[in-house]
Swiss-Prot record:
Biased composition range(s): Basic residues: 1-10, 18-29
Family matches, as Pfam families: ResIII
Region feature Disordered, mapped onto this chain: 1-30
Lineage: Viruses, Duplodnaviria, Heunggongvirae, Peploviricota, Herviviricetes
GO molecular function, one term: hydrolase activity
Protein name: Uncharacterized protein ORF67
InterPro entries to which the protein is assigned, alphabetical: Helicase/UvrB_N, P-loop_NTPase
Source organism: Ostreid herpesvirus 1 (isolate France)
């Protein structure tokens, strides 16, 4: 529209152009519709030029200020679509749970000084997103706390976490682990008798504190630590994890036999819910001073970019090498078979992990003359692997870190917390399947496991939501002091599980809380026909790849070669004599898969 100007006072004002009739008739603007494509163009114009330190794979620059929550997105060249609806509006169900007031931002050393300085009785709630050093603060506090008894009680929710904390303490003080029952009992007796000669840490699972060792007169300690408090106390409030009578007995032991006889109560979690803090303070009881500490991040966020894809993992594509990220499964096969990269995948179910492994092996192109070494690590595969080792059937690895180090594709159950960070050095891509369901662990625990994958070579997380369920937390019971927590968690679960859209929004908000610089994208969607759930194709491909139930495990000594049957679990061996068997090498070349 042509403009003319008119002087009004000392200013020139733009006026509409005159019509042909010269009457100055007002011109009605055309109805303009801003399309999604126009918004994308507008965003691209505002993107700053790409600096020299950009990782070509991630499309993300170095973070100058690790506390800056503004996305540092520089674009990418894989064709994915920038998600215009970045972090959705935060609903009250999440605000009320995780965004309370009066939290004090604090560094790790300062937090240790508050926890350990001798003063009156106190309750300390300590939270911090992934990478803030919560475990380090805990271990430092255990080493520096002073008191009259020399005893510290550390309560956890998983036995894996008990073993990891014992490892992290690393000989700085004596550790009594409840898994060693006789030694643990002797340590409790020494503490009650005042016979301890050094600082001692007693590590116990919350399910075991009702033992007779704690039912006597109150057990005196200098400090009680409840690590991953929401996971730990979920054992009490969840109907599926503990019976009502056992939950009441556990609550009574905490409130009557343990908390009144300590000077310091420290509860720790990544996103410590406000009602959980209130409930723990009520359980602590008596007179005390309360501290709410929020640890400042000490390292850059692990992920800068999150690509959302469909989770139809059981699709076998005839041509998986084309770069199409419409599903997580296609992104996985592209990274493995086209790029030859090592990847790590988290899934919420043991069964899902096994099915995903089968489909990854079945998607191998015919011209691809290697087989990826796919390792599944869940509670069931761990126990089965240990049983084979004890029976002297195989010489395979057992520990999660050793298995992750040798795998080409590492699939683990996100609901089985390893209790510690995993070194993923050499892994080029991370994939996460999420699920909102009362049969699996909480969404917070699923998210937390994504942050335990340290030192991976990519800053991109490929993720997708498998399914949602109405009222997924309906199995949470009301326990006196934790009643408000249970009520608000059920409300949060109902909102997350009420629709697939709410589930996606909820995970975006929680990812943004965990990784402040993260930028969301949507995987490229291209229409095509799928051989969807075609079992004939899957079974035929698996037979061609020798990924059948019966595998030959090769030991270094030929006299010990034998067949081992394990459902859906391919077994591998080293030092295979060449040209004596029909076999394929793994991608890394460390192992060979023998054809049945």
């Amino acid at each position: 529209m042509r403009l003319r100007s008119q002087k009004r006072g000392n200013k020139f004002v733009a006026l509409p152009a005159k019509t042909r009739k010269g009457k100055g008739k007002k011109l009605k603007p055309k109805n303009l519709t801003i399309t999604k494509k126009d918004e994308v163009k507008k965003i691209k114009k505002t993107i700053t030029p790409k600096p020299n330190n950009i990782d070509e794979d991630d499309g993300i620059g170095e973070v100058d200020d690790i506390m800056d929550i503004t996305p540092n997105y520089q674009g990418n060249n894989d064709g994915n679509e920038l998600d215009l609806q970045q972090t959705p509006i935060i609903p009250n169900e999440i605000k009320d749970l995780f965004m309370g007031d009066n939290w004090r931002k604090i560094s790790g050393p300062h937090a240790v000084s508050i926890i350990t300085k001798p003063q009156h009785r106190r309750y300390i709630a300590l939270k911090g997103t992934m990478g803030t050093g919560k475990t380090h603060v805990t271990v430092e506090s255990l080493n520096k706390i002073t008191g009259s008894t020399g005893s510290i009680l550390l309560i956890v929710g998983r036995k894996e976490l008990a073993n990891e904390i014992e490892r992290r303490i690393n000989g700085s003080c004596k550790v009594y682990n409840y898994l060693e029952k006789e030694e643990f009992s002797n340590g409790i007796s020494l503490s009650r008798g005042g016979l301890l000669t050094e600082r001692c840490v007693f590590i116990v699972c919350v399910n075991s504190i009702t033992t007779d060792l704690f039912k006597e007169d109150g057990f005196k300690t200098d400090m009680i630590v409840v690590d991953e408090v929401e996971t730990t106390f979920m054992n009490i409030v969840s109907e599926s994890l503990m019976t009502y009578s056992a939950a009441i007995e556990t609550r009574n032991t905490l409130v009557e036999k343990l908390f009144p006889y300590t000077n310091v109560l420290l509860t720790i979690d990544a996103a410590l819910a406000e009602p959980m803090v209130v409930g723990c303070a009520k359980m602590f009881g008596g007179k005390f001073e309360e501290y709410k500490l929020d640890l400042v991040r000490i390292r850059p966020p692990i992920y800068h970019r999150a690509v959302q894809c469909s989770t139809a993992y059981n699709i076998i594509d005839h041509n998986p090498l084309e770069k199409r990220y419409d599903t997580l499964f296609n992104a996985i096969t592209y990274h493995v078979y086209e790029l030859g990269k090592r990847i790590v995948i988290s899934v919420p179910y043991h069964k899902t992990a096994l099915q995903l492994k089968r489909h990854i092996l079945a998607a191998r192109p015919q011209h691809f003359h290697k087989i990826p070494h796919v390792v599944v690590y869940t509670a069931k595969t761990r126990d089965a692997r240990l049983a084979r080792i004890k029976a002297l059937q195989t010489g395979e690895q057992y520990g999660i870190e050793a298995l992750a180090k040798e795998a080409d594709v590492f699939i683990f159950n996100s609901c089985m917390s390893a209790g510690h960070s995993l070194n993923m050095d050499g892994y080029e891509a991370c994939f996460s399947y999420f699920l909102i369901n009362h049969m699996t662990c909480s969404v917070m625990e699923q998210l937390q496991m994504t942050a335990r994958l340290r030192n991976n070579n990519s800053k991109t997380l490929y993720w997708g939501l498998m399914n949602t369920m109405n009222d997924p937390l309906r199995g949470i019971r009301d326990i006196e002091e934790l009643k408000t927590y249970s009520t608000m968690m059920r409300k949060f679960g109902k909102w997350m599980g009420s629709s697939f859209d709410n589930g996606i929004k909820g995970f975006k908000i929680l990812l943004k809380m965990a990784y402040p610089n993260i930028v969301f994208e949507k995987g490229v969607v291209k229409s095509r026909e799928y051989p969807y759930k075609n079992n004939e194709i899957i079974n035929q491909t698996m037979q061609n790849d020798a990924s059948v139930l019966r595998k030959l495990f090769i030991n270094p000594e030929p006299s010990k070669w034998r067949f081992v049957t394990q459902e859906h679990e391919a077994l591998y061996g080293k030092d295979l004599p060449p040209r004596q068997f029909n076999y394929y090498s793994t991608l890394s070349g460390l192992y060979n898969v023998v054809l049945s």
